[in-house]
Amino acid sequence: MAALIRAAMAAALVFAATLAGAQGAAPPDTPAAPAKHVMLFISDGASWGTWHMASYYEHGALGHQPYDAFSVKLGMTTVPLNTSSVPTGNTTRTVSYDPARAWDTTPLAGQLGGRPHHFAGYEYLRRDATDSAAAATALASGTKTYNGAINHDNLGRALTYATQRAKARGQATGVLTSVPFSHATPAAFGAQSASRNSYGAISEQMLANPALDLIMGAGHPLFDADGRPRSSPDHRYVSAAAWAALQGPASPRTLVQTRADFEALALGQLQPRLPLLGLVQVHDTLQANRNVAVVGANPGLPSGAATIPGVPTLATMTRGALQLLGHQPKGFFMMVEGGAVDWMAHANNTARVIEEQMDFNHAVQAAVDWVHTHSHWGESLIIVLTDHGNGMPMGPGSDRVPFEPIRNHGQGVLPGVRWHHGSHSNENTLLWAHGQGAQQLLQAAQTVDPALVSRLGHNRDGRTLTNADVARVLVPAP
């Protein structure tokens, strides 16, 4: 089987070379002007099946998401430089992605973490995965590094990242997330740290960062996971010093906290001064970690749990950010993360993965609507991707049928899913892009994975790039 896949890969390479313009790629010697407005959407930890299960639940079919109509569709590999958790002092890559091994359907005995391998490809995909810090660093800086690094390379040097480059170009900047803003992915767009776990120091760095005009996310020290006031502060994600600095007239940022204020921002009814921190009144996730015993039931939602009433949606936050950044004369760069998709994928919680992915999809729709209303695709770029897979969700028979897709049970019904892992996976992920500069991603896609076509139906030629390639297109150096 591996030999057949390698033969198919060779054929696909010839096909891709012949059809270099299959997705409308511009000639390599025609540099595109950078987009005025750049929006990067990251559904953290979204394996192929994650995108599909949310579409099946919400729409009963694939093809109805805002990014499904985008002009550029690519694969994106996510492996780190190495799997060390500390810098090893060199630039040698020790891990890679091999399509032939990733899609190998040879039956395989054995197990990892109590889960059977089933097939050689599954076993391969469970190994050598990136963490969110290294993945986000590659997306933000263009440099592969060790797991755990926030804009630090494997030699221990601090790296320039996307919001710094955007600010140097005169653009406004924003970072939004459904998890604490000091967590790995948002941190990589506003901080530099040898370790992702230094949440308090990262929060202080981000809040004082002149390259960040707007920050929105969770991590509120005074509220718990269900949005209830705490008896004493929890400063895990926002340090006591950072929180103290936000109080009073000398605060480094305008502070927005209530759902009502986030909704007023989204409607343009509130115009606070930048820089701004939108700190949602919840501790770790917007909604993903809520307890049904506290919030009550809502059978109309996938999980059956009502939502926390005082918490805005990621889509509302996105609209609010666009109200504040969208009128800046030189444009803006904005990163929006559906971070809790990853948290729920670690738990293999199908219903809550779907809820989080749906909220993420609605945030993308808000940005597309903004482009149609306030801008145009000749000056705006939207990229939708994940930083890595997580959980390897496939169809219910995928223990017998290799790579069986998620099974559609119709709109409003949980799809058929079998999870094969409880952590990150080394898979070729899915990317969509549209607007000014999207064609440059095609030019950066120098490898081919035939299964993007044959198994996933994602694009027409299997073209694939790396996460570091995306960074080089995202915000060019001024």
Region spans (language model):
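Bacterial N-terminal signal peptides that target proteins for export
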Residues: M1-M9
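N-terminal signal peptide c-region/cleavage motif recognized by signal peptidases
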Residues: A17-L19
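Acidic, polar low-complexity linker/tail segments
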Residues: A26-P34
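A post-motif C-terminal structural segment
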Residues: A35-V38, S43-T130, A135-T137, S178, ...
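RNA-binding basic/glycine-rich loop and surface signature characteristic of RAMP-family CRISPR effectors
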Residues: T143
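Glycine-rich anion/phosphate-binding loops
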Residues: D153-A158
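Glycine-rich phosphate/pyrophosphate-binding loops
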Residues: A162-Q164, A168-A187
